[in-house]
Amino acid sequence: MMKVLVVVALLVTLISYSSSEGIDDLEADELLSLMANEHPRKECIPKHHECTSNKHGCCRGNFFKYKCQCTTVVAQDGEQTERCFCGTPPHHKAAELVVGFGKKIFG
């Protein structure tokens, strides 16, 4: 019984977190353009593809929207450039693992 309560608590936390984060992802300009329907929907950027020029354009994964994760690359001459790719953050990976494990046990 305790395992069921823990899994239910995790699922409620994940759902509330994902819904609040989805709201945070929309910037004011994006929200206005969605409301006014000014621009057609742009194609999203798939997982592991570069998102340096469009950091809010990543596609959705199984449960969560992919996040644009950036890193600084230092060339041999010392020049630093920022490179970004769409990926699953570690806390989303953990949540997907818990949900997948819960499905195997209870579903």
UniProtKB/Swiss-Prot annotation:
Subcellular location per the Swiss-Prot or TrEMBL entry: Secreted
Lineage of the species this protein comes from: Eukaryota, Metazoa, Ecdysozoa, Arthropoda, Chelicerata
Xref: InterPro entries: Spider_toxin_CSTX_knottin (IPR019553), Spider_toxin_CSTX_Knottin_CS (IPR011142)
Highest taxon, organism lineage: Eukaryota
Tissue: Expressed by the venom gland.
The UniProt record lists the keyword Signal: yes
Disulfide bridges in this chain: C44-C59, C51-C68, C58-C86, C70-C84
MF (Gene Ontology): toxin activity
Main location: secreted
Domain statement: The presence of a 'disulfide through disulfide knot' structurally defines this protein as a knottin.
Pfam families named among the record's database cross-references: Toxin_35 (PF10530)
Signal peptide: 1-20
Organism this protein belongs to: Lycosa singoriensis (Wolf spider)
A GO CC term assigned to this protein in UniProt: extracellular region
Family: Belongs to the neurotoxin 19 (CSTX) family. 04 (U1-Lctx) subfamily.
Propiece residue ranges: 21-41
Protein keywords: Disulfide bond, Knottin, Secreted, Signal, Toxin
UniProt-recorded name of the protein: U1-lycotoxin-Ls1x
